[in-house]
């Protein structure tokens, strides 16, 4: 078996504290770079545990379409700012942060008081702007989870009239790209490859730790295959994933792509999962740019579709 190594050749931290790491993995046998890159990318984008704001309580407010006296931002803006917080919670339980502020004040993430188990990655993230003579009181709920969790309108928690639920994005990795480079030809004429991988995180974890965690998950996934035991099982009907239930509107597609998909009777991610890349291109007025836009939007929530139709 060919021995390879992984080297981090670049590491950058942006103003918003997001981190970008570039790694070079090799030498690999021909075809192994694609296998490794696709496997790592899928786990990195949708399989890692992260922290997210799941609900916000604002004093005197009982629905998200309200405005707050003396606060420049409306409730929807404040909820969006809270949703975009990069947070790292080491607690397996619900953590609650609190803010009591008086104007004039530009409220930032660092002004929210959490326990020592919660770290706010980008403390300069704006939350709200309070005018003189006015107050703002917030209660922010933070949980750990995996992937994307939409609000369950039927749950008991959502029945609290003043607790505003948020669709939670627990994914600490924002983007993964990889390329494959040909290296020297080995003895016997076999080509070698190197995998170059770029990993961008929200700052709640480092690219190094993200790759290590993804690799450990893949090891746990494949380890049972080393000792295969044949067991007859009764097949179960798979339950639809939360991601499949996301409506088309929440993918934030361009107007052109959105309208074309709507005309093709595509209303949710579940509908898109029945398409291949080739199928998308056959939609009327749907070009490669729109198809690439859909692919990128699906990959942000950990879903990929095949390049071509499955041959019979």
Curated annotation (Swiss-Prot):
GO MF, one annotated term: protein dimerization activity
Organism: Prochlorococcus marinus (strain MIT 9215)
Enzyme Commission code(s) on record: 2.7.7.6
NCBIfam families referenced in this protein's UniProt entry, alphabetically: PRK05182.2-2, PRK05182.2-5, rpoA
Enzyme superclass (EC): transferase
Subunit structure: In cyanobacteria the RNAP catalytic core is composed of 2 alpha, 1 beta, 1 beta', 1 gamma and 1 omega subunit. When a sigma factor is associated with the core the holoenzyme is formed, which can initiate transcription.
Keywords in alphabetical order: DNA-directed RNA polymerase, Nucleotidyltransferase, Transcription, Transferase
Record remark on domains: The N-terminal domain is essential for RNAP assembly and basal transcription, whereas the C-terminal domain is involved in interaction with transcriptional regulators and with upstream promoter elements.
Pfam families, per database record: RNA_pol_A_bac, RNA_pol_A_CTD, RNA_pol_L
Domain of life according to the entry: Bacteria
Protein name: DNA-directed RNA polymerase subunit alpha
Region annotation Alpha C-terminal domain (alpha-CTD): where it falls in the sequence: 241-312
Coiled-coil boundaries: none
GO terms, biological process: DNA-templated transcription
Signal peptide as annotated in the record: none
Region Alpha N-terminal domain (alpha-NTD), residue ranges: 1-229
InterPro entries according to UniProt: DNA-dir_RNA_pol_insert (IPR011262), DNA-dir_RNA_pol_RpoA/D/Rpb3 (IPR011263), DNA-dir_RpoA (IPR011773), RBP11-like (IPR036603), RNAP_asu_C (IPR011260), RNApol_insert_sf (IPR036643)
Membrane-spanning intervals of the chain: none
Annotated Gene3D superfamilies: 5' to 3' exonuclease, C-terminal subdomain, DNA-directed RNA polymerase, insert domain, RNA polymerase, RBP11-like subunit
Reactions listed under catalytic activity: RNA(n) + a ribonucleoside 5'-triphosphate = RNA(n+1) + diphosphate
GO CC terms, sorted: cytoplasm; DNA-directed RNA polymerase complex
Similarity comment text for this entry: Belongs to the RNA polymerase alpha chain family.
Its biological purpose: DNA-dependent RNA polymerase catalyzes the transcription of DNA into RNA using the four ribonucleoside triphosphates as substrates.
């Amino acid at each position: 078996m060919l021995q390879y190594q992984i080297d981090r050749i670049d590491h950058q931290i942006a103003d918003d504290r997001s981190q970008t790491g570039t790694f070079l993995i090799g030498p690999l046998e021909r075809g192994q770079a694609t296998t490794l890159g696709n496997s790592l990318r899928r786990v990195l984008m949708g399989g890692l545990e992260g922290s997210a704001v799941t609900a916000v309580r604002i004093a005197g407010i009982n629905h998200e379409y309200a405005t707050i006296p003396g606060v420049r931002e409306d409730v929807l803006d404040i909820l969006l700012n809270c949703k975009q917080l990069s947070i790292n919670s080491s607690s397996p339980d619900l953590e609650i942060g609190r803010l009591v502020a008086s104007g004039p004040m530009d409220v930032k993430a660092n002004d929210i008081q959490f326990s020592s188990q919660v770290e706010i990655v980008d403390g300069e993230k704006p939350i709200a702007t309070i005018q003189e003579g006015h107050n703002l009181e917030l209660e922010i709920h933070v949980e750990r989870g995996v992937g994307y969790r939409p609000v369950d309108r039927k749950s008991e928690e959502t029945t609290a009239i003043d607790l505003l639920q948020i669709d939670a994005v627990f994914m600490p990795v924002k983007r993964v790209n990889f390329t494959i480079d040909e290296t020297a030809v080995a003895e016997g004429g076999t080509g070698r490859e190197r995998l170059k991988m770029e990993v961008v995180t929200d700052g709640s974890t480092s690219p190094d730790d993200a790759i290590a965690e993804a690799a450990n998950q893949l090891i746990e996934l494949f380890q049972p295959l080393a000792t295969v035991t044949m067991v007859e099982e009764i097949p179960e009907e798979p339950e639809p994933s939360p991601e499949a239930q996301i409506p088309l509107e929440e993918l934030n597609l361009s107007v052109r792509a959105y309208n074309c998909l709507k005309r093709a009777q595509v209303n949710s991610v579940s509908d898109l999962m029945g398409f291949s890349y080739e199928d998308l291109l056959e939609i009327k007025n749907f070009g490669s740019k729109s198809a690439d836009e859909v692919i990128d939007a699906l990959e942000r929530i950990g879903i990929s579709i095949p390049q071509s139709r499955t041959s019979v």
